[in-house]
Amino acid sequence: LVVVNAMKNSPWATSTVVATIPIAILVGFYMRFIRPGRVLEATAIGVILLLMAVYMGSIIDNSESMRSYFDHSGLFLAWSLIIYGFIAAVLPIWMLLAPRDYLSTFVKLGTIIFLAIAIAILQPEIKMPAVTQFVDGSGPIFGGSVFPFVFITIACGAISGFHALISSGTTPKLIDNERHIPMIGYGGMLLEAFVAIMAMVAACVLEPGIYFAINSPAGVVGTEANEIISKINSWGYSVTVEQMNQLAKDVGESTLFARTGGAPSLAVGMATIFANAFGKHLLALWYHFAIMFEAVFILTTLDSGTRVGRFMLQDMLGNLHPKLGQTSWLPSIILASFIVVSCWGYFLYIGVIDPNGGVNILWPLFGIANQMLAAIALSVGTAILIKSDKIKFAWIT
């Protein structure tokens, strides 16, 4: 849903994100067949092509003949993402998932380190209040309990059940030695926490009025610009139609109103920091680079999550018929992938057509399920330690 809201009616963002798919496949073929073992070469090619994709997106956005191919509604993009998720789950891991994950790691770490340097140079003022009306359940965007929504904000930055699924299924197949686990597992979560802090800073340096104008769903604030501004001003946050129109123009978008999901507001925050530190005339380029940066690693979550879900489902189906449990049997792969994609695809569809942007449906479900998975993973880890006669380490889990 985050990716859909970032790309809808945005030819620049859509073309850039779409370009990352053939780039990842090219890198996969390069490392497997063309130049096996030449990791640095493949990395350089992939990163350069990703940066070129951002620049080419601006050319497409300014081309009347080409922009129509990438200017799509949220519903069209949702169906496209569902089809993509199915194909990604069926393809061999080396072809798309592994190179996309690998490239996204470099882009993610490089961008966040770059962002941290820019923040250190600028020392921007935090403009978001320490707490909003949401803490007492009255809004501003919607009313609801702090719990489980607090878990949404810390999901990847502190403890994540989804990461537990990936680290128990995909990651073990990619490591050579158990001694590598602390650096990958613990180091990975430290970096996730670092990413979470940088993302929070990028969002909080925006004027609250601008932040809420971007993040408020149409079902809450309306669809007309004046109606949206009036609603946000009534919450006590100052913003004007002229401000929002100018900001949209500066970042190369037709509008930024009701672009929920977090990706557009984070991209605006990151772009503002980068532009103030390294050149304001590149604001649009920074914005779409940030969108690409977010979409690339969010799509890796989609790839990995669907594949892990397929493995788990095949494992269960194997109890009904042995062939269904074979992860190399194509009919079983297709069936399990279709079921898993249908499940999350349904919620994506509901979120897209929901005038509130899925905030009352998807996000509570995510917050609850993610932490429940984490609790289960820690319980399983504790049981394994005890069974392995390593009870002295059980306090860790």
Q: Model-found features: residue ranges?
A:
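Transmembrane helix-loop junctions in multi-pass membrane proteins
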Residues: V2-S10, G28-R35, A53-R67, A88-A98, ...
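Extracellular/periplasmic helix-exit of transmembrane alpha-helices
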Residues: I119-V135, L190-V268, S304, Y349-D354
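Membrane-interfacial loop-to-helix junctions in multi-pass transporters
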Residues: W12-A19, D71-F76, D136-F149, F278-H288, ...
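Hydrophobic, membrane-embedded alpha-helices of multi-pass small-molecule transporters
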Residues: D71-L91, A118-P124, D136-D176, I184, ...
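Helix-loop-helix connectors at the membrane interface of multi-pass transporters/channels
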Residues: V3-W12, L26-G28, I59-S63, S168-A193, ...
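Helix-loop junctions at the membrane interface of multi-pass solute transporters
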Residues: A88, I93-R100, T153-H180, I184-M189, ...
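Membrane-interface loop-to-helix entry segments
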Residues: P11-Y55, F70, G74-I121, R310-Q314, ...
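Loop-to-transmembrane helix boundary motifs in multi-pass membrane proteins
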Residues: G187-F194, T260-G262, H281-A290, A295, ...
